[in-house]
């Protein structure tokens, strides 16, 4: 079975085409600037890159171009579209209804529309991508894989906010959590690497990129996560503030004469390590500036490392212990310095980092803790696309 995995943004589209027989990525690519001038498709096969610049007025045009690239006589990997067994779609928000991935039908589409109010930036392009694929491949099964689904096992006492309860019942205001597909993948992978049943493990997974979240996984289930009703809650991120005193918001609105859109923009796009450092939202730039003596850049990193460290400690308390910690995503996988700083002062939990292991190599799964470290620490590259493909494969196989 060969599965196309689609991840639609507002003006972009990422894809992978995976042969599930051996889980090989046959092709992958990125479409940028959809609906704008200079729209471009970068298509990769066996590390060979092909760039196609062609006008794409919408996501349907973009997906048609992706299908053309996959079936191209020179650069393609299949002869025709009948070789695409099914399509797996990343969907950011499934609300409370979906705790698992699901075959897309009319009822599912209706539910996705209802979730737009919970994810106004993310769900609309996800829906547009699904509709475009359905128009181009009407007889191909489609599966929705939700970022929020993995966190539906979080207990009620952990997901309820201390607000009037009727706000939860009427508006669905509660913790949902995000990056669920990534947290699910690396928690399963670390259990495999440790040679243990995931049901016997207490795992803390740290998805650290421009967007970042921490997850507590107990017996294979998410029991707590740092992102909340939106991806704004939690640790300081690239441009997002993370959790702050809510009373700051009306104070800022009054003092700076901000409206709600201004405030939303400030919290989501001008805060985080970018807001503190004044340098960049890219951690590589901030690390470089800190090394050159920029005090605000160093402060931004100190704040970030402290926030992550604090969540690791609190999640160990939430689970009554921890067996392993996993670092993943851009920063988690590539910054040995950040991993080392985060793990400082966590010796009381039984975490001991091996400097040599932490600094050697990247791009593969590895243990970075000392052999006698009570809590094992891993770096594991995430693979959300493979997780989406696996879910899609399982659901579609059961249809037959």
Swiss-Prot record:
Q: Which Pfam families match?
A: Acetate_kinase
Reactions catalysed, as given in the entry: acetate + ATP = acetyl phosphate + ADP
Which terms in the GO cellular component ontology are assigned? cytoplasm
Q: Supply one GO BP term.
A: acetyl-CoA biosynthetic process
Please give one Gene Ontology molecular function term for this protein: ATP binding
Q: Does the keyword Aminoacyl-tRNA synthetase apply?
A: no
* Cellular compartment(s): Cytoplasm
InterPro entries to which the protein is assigned, alphabetical: Ac/propionate_kinase, Aliphatic_acid_kin_short-chain, Aliphatic_acid_kinase_CS, ATPase_NBD
> What residues does substrate bind to?
90
Q: Which keywords accompany this UniProt record?
A: ATP-binding, Cytoplasm, Kinase, Magnesium, Metal-binding, Nucleotide-binding, Transferase
Q: What does this protein do?
A: Catalyzes the formation of acetyl phosphate from acetate and ATP. Can also catalyze the reverse reaction.
Q: What is this protein called?
A: Acetate kinase
């Amino acid at each position: 079975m060969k599965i196309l995995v689609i991840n639609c943004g507002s003006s972009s589209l990422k894809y992978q085409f995976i042969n599930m027989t051996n889980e090989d990525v046959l092709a992958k690519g990125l479409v940028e600037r959809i609906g704008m001038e200079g729209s471009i498709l970068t298509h990769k096969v066996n590390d060979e890159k092909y760039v196609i610049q062609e006008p794409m007025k919408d996501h349907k045009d973009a997906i048609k171009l992706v299908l053309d690239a996959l079936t191209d006589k020179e650069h393609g990997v299949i002869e025709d579209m009948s070789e695409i067994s099914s399509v797996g779609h990343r969907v950011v928000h499934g609300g409370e209804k979906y705790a698992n991935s699901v075959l897309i039908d009319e009822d599912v589409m209706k539910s996705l529309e209802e979730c737009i109010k919970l994810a106004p930036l993310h769900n609309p392009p996800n829906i547009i991508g699904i509709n475009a694929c359905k128009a181009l491949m009407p007889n191909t099964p489609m599966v929705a894989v939700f970022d929020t689904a993995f966190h539906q096992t979080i207990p009620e006492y952990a997901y309820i906010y201390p607000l009037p309860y009727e706000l939860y019942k009427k508006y669905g205001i509660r913790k949902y959590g995000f990056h669920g597909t990534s947290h699910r993948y690396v928690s399963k992978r670390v259990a495999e690497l440790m040679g243990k049943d995931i049901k016997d493990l207490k795992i803390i997974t740290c998805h650290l990129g421009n967007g970042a979240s921490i997850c507590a996984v107990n017996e294979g289930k998410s029991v707590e996560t740092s992102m909340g009703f939106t991806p704004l809650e939690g640790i300081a991120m690239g441009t997002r503030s993370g959790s702050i005193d809510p009373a700051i918001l009306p104070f800022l609105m009054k003092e700076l004469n901000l409206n709600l859109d201004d405030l939303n923009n400030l919290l989501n796009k001008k805060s985080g390590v970018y807001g503190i450092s004044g340098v960049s939202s890219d951690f590589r730039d901030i690390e470089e500036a800190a090394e050159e003596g920029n005090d605000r850049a160093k402060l931004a990193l100190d704040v970030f490392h402290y926030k992550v460290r604090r969540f690791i400690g609190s999640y160990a308390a939430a689970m009554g212990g921890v067996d392993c910690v996993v670092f993943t995503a851009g920063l988690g996988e590539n910054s040995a310095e950040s991993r080392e700083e985060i793990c400082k002062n966590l010796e009381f939990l039984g975490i001991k980092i091996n400097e040599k292991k932490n600094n050697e190599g990247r791009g593969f799964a590895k243990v970075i803790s000392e052999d006698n470290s009570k809590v094992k620490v891993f770096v594991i590259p995430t693979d959300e696309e493979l997780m989406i493909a696996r879910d899609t494969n399982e659901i579609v196989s059961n249809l037959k």
